[in-house]
Every structure is written in structure tokens, then in C-alpha cells.
Amino acid sequence: QPALSNMVRKAEKEMGAPIFDRSTIPLTVTKEGAYYIRTVEKILFLERNLERYFQDIAGLQGGTLALGGASYFCSFVYPDLIARFQTKYPQVTIDLTEGNTRELKAGLENESLDLVLETAMEKDDTSIKRYLFRKENLILAVPESFPVNRKLQPYRLSRQEILSKSFLKPEVEAVPLKEFKDVPFITMKPGNDMYKRGAKICRNSGFTMKTVMMVDQVLTSLNIVSNGVGAMFVRSDIVQWRPEDPRLVYYKLDDPLSEREITFSVKRGRYVTAAMREFMRLAGIRSDDPDTDPVAGRQKE
């Protein structure tokens, strides 16, 4: 790669210091080189923001909007928003990427993704700005065949209670979760917010979750739950996308962790384009919130 080597040596000559330590195998970046690379990245970041700004002046007459999310959001949340957006702005191309939290975070960092819809972006991550889309609630899905259900009949949730969200009313009792201490659980894989959250909810009820199987996809796991393998924590909204299944029983949870935020995430400091702003506006979000209160963008109903 002579061309690249020449570029590196030219840069080193201009800055008067080596970028790489060539006495090591493999090559390592010098202190001066690391500073040089960070500075170049900042310059390129500013150039991309400048380019996006001038592209915006032309309005929403072209360009691409890169969206990312977990499989659930790509399957059930994005389609409606994308259809509404493209009806209004058919000249803008939508690029939708499905991935796990690590992949989506990397997409924001390298700017291959403009917006990410997720529940698991860390609140204390200063590199990400988050806009609240809505909140969701977790419930417990249990195979109907499990004997533990016999004594918990009064706590069962009907499909209508879940779809109407009336189960959130204070008068609807949550199941005593400790009754499931000996029940096998199906979980998402470690690193997934649902895995960490479910484990904490069980610990808060005085027991450790007995995991018998780990999966990547919530939709896959519900099919496994319905076949009697184990119980699982799921988002209540998923019930509306499945046909009624007598093999499943659902219960309300009484734990603050059973409620979580769904947010649109943007790389902090990057230029928020007109397409990004308009997409979030169609989702009911104001995209002009101050950095001091990033998760305050949801418009009042």
C-alpha cells in the first residue's frame, strides 16, 4: 500500500512527529499520532455536519435517512412511521438496519445510522442524545400447562386487559413473582436489556432466575414459551401482534423495572438533518430539546 504509506509519511513530515512507532510489531500509534488521528476525526465530523447543513437548504427533495433498531421495532414500529414519512417525502430513500445494541451503537458512532429506536441505550452515555418516543411495560408470559398457574388464577390477565392497557390500573393486582422461583425461564442472551432487567426483577422478589434457554429474538422465544419450555418476561405490546393463544398465560408485574423507555438515539453533536427532524416529528417528538434534558422530547398527547 505505497499510496497510503506516502500519505502517512507526508502527514508526519508536516506535523514534525511520527504517527506510528515502526520499531514495534505490529505498528503502534504514538502519543502524537493518537492526537493527530483524534483531531482529523473531529475535522471530518465537522465537514460532514457542514455538508448535511447545506444539503438541508435544498429541503427534503432527496438524500437518505438511515434508521436502525432491534427486530421488534423494525417489524412492528418502524413500518407505520416509514409509510407515513415516505407518503409525505417520497424523494427521500429510507435505509433500515436491524441489529443488536452493540451493532446499533456502533452505527451511531460511525454515522452509518442517523436514528436508532431502542430501549437499551445507556442514560449516562454522554456520546448519545436520546429523545423519548414512549414508554412500555413488561409482563410475564407463562406456559398454561405449568402447575403454578392453578393457584394464580385470580392474577391472570385477559387479552383485552393487555390490549387496552387497563391492566396498568392500580386495582389490577400484580402476580406475587416469588411463586415462580422454581419455574424454568427462557431469557434473552446476556448483554440484552431484557436479560439484565428480568434477572433484577427476579432478585428483587428474592430469587435467582432458573434459566434453561437463551434466545436472540423475542418472537422466537414466545413460540418456545407456548410449547411449554419456560416462562419469560416480554413487552406487553407484543401481544397485539400475535393471535390469541390458549397455551399462554400472562401476568402483571409489580416492579419499577417493568416499565422502560423507548427512545430515538442520535450521536451527540452531529447535525440533525431535516429528514431526521421530520421523521421524529411524525413520531410525536420535538427534536429541538436542550442537551441538558435530552429525554424530554415527547409531545403531550
Model-derived regions: residue spans:
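A short LG(V/I)-centered, amphipathic sequence patch enriched
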Residues: 12-29
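Short Pro/Gly-enriched coil loops immediately N-terminal to beta-strands
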Residues: 71, 130-144, 153-163, 180, ...
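Alpha-helical linker/hinge and terminal dimerization helices associated
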Residues: 14-15, 36-58, 279, 290-293
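Secondary-structure junction motif
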Residues: 142, 148-205, 272-276, 280, ...
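Central regulatory/effector-binding core of bacterial HTH transcription factors
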Residues: 63-125, 214
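A late-sequence structural motif
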Residues: 77, 144, 236-239, 244-292
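Hydrophobic hinge/microswitch elements
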Residues: 100-104, 109-112, 119, 187-247
